[in-house]
């Protein structure tokens, strides 16, 4: 509770305009002379013991009133004292309780209405005790309300439909790593994940020292990968029939639905004031998509309706000690799709389709994914056959977690995860069945008889955040004989190294052919030795390296080192024409997005970024 107490000659107010949280009925205008004005802002931590906070507030007001010998109190809700406000219902209840407690103590009390834009005038008496501010929190020994006890059960379901104890899967596999993390038996591993060094040493991403922790700078090579991953996600959802939108990154907490949805996420939010409005930075794209949906005229014939946004950016105020590399950030890019479904049966069908997309992303990125399916016991009992079907369709065992009761907006969800070099899960694609948000945001359609229907909504990130996808791809390189990216994601797909300056013109001709064929090719024309240039191509993880000299110029045949097929100290080399190489790379990258080089073609023009 934030409290500002002012001993005044008078206070008068007039309610001008309602907000969505407006208290009604109310006293629209009032005045109190020779009064102690108590400006109050009820804060979210007060919910831990609101009765204790009310008691402390009444005591603080009473002590001040006694010192200034004042028997009149105006309780005035004033949200601008805090950027971490409590839920409106709790705030109103607290303010009413303060009013009633003061009246019982013998004070003459008036209370300005909650949730209105109001004009007010007051005249502060100006004596040494006329102004006081207080910050009140629940006492350390306050008894917090007990959380609902939820029982969690874990077991493994196989594609054959059989149920197994999780202990049967305690081996060294990626699936076992997921199980150990979920049931709490994973052994903590020290040190930084592999990708943290790689993201900087390969000049993909760097830290930004003059920004907040967890906000990164993307360098050209990393920006290219990031953009390709975003293009890939867009192509997936367009093929699936989703319609892209773009919505704001910040929202007004005065909107009841926005506040309630944000409040479910707890304290890990960026909140701030914009003028007299309490705002938040989104932690997902659902805020803007849901407000868009509630303003639409939706017919059952439109459903399922799929809406997509590349959330650039979403913000989560993670604990500073938890922020690491690309895995856990405070600002990240989330491909986010929401599907408004006709009914639960329709939602289950869409769930299957979107889960299949999630599995596909693992294959396309070259990262092995494992899965955990979570639902309430009631949902599992009713839809066990359907759950067995999606496990069968997935073709791999899936960890099942059942909850004794629903505590989230979803009744069922699946999380797919890659496993990093330290045997820890990196959660990426997800699909969730949301049965709360349509009601909260007023998203509805009408049946022929006029009945209102608040339909289920699927939340789906087909890839997971772009940063975590890249994290998983980099972590996966520890499992490769020679570290490499999928060719369609490699910043330089082909590097041409002329033996001498006499071969530079021929190298440029090859590079031009490759570029016209939508292949990213550069030329190492620097004044370095041939061996140093070859090592540099390896350090840059170039997919195909061509050294051109007299033999290549005369024959037209190129000797090409293929990184993905090489072994340590044993490069895999093939001989082919430029046309054949173009055909090979075309087949390898078919169906994947393309962007040109983000760095100069001639390496002599490329600066170092780190």
UniProtKB/Swiss-Prot annotation:
Gene3D superfamilies the record matches: Anticodon-binding domain, Bira Bifunctional Protein, Domain 2, D-tyrosyl-tRNA(Tyr) deacylase
GO BP terms in the entry: threonyl-tRNA aminoacylation
Needed co-factor(s): Zn(2+)
InterPro entries registered for this protein in UniProt: aa-tRNA-synt_IIb, aa-tRNA-synth_II, aa-tRNA-synth_II/BPL/LPL, Anticodon-bd, Anticodon-bd_dom_sf, DTD-like_sf, Thr-tRNA-ligase_IIa, Threonyl-tRNA_syn_edit_dom_arc
Subcellular location(s) of the protein: Cytoplasm
An example Gene Ontology CC term for this record: cytoplasm
Cofactor mode of binding and number, as noted: Binds 1 zinc ion per subunit.
GO terms, molecular function: ATP binding; threonine-tRNA ligase activity; tRNA binding; zinc ion binding
Chief location category: cytoplasm
Keyword set includes Transmembrane helix: no
Database matches in Pfam families: HGTP_anticodon (PF03129), tRNA-synt_2b (PF00587), tRNA-Thr_ED (PF08915)
Subunit description: Homodimer.
Name of the protein this chain belongs to: Threonine--tRNA ligase
Species of the source: Methanospirillum hungatei JF-1 (strain ATCC 27890 / DSM 864 / NBRC 100397 / JF-1)
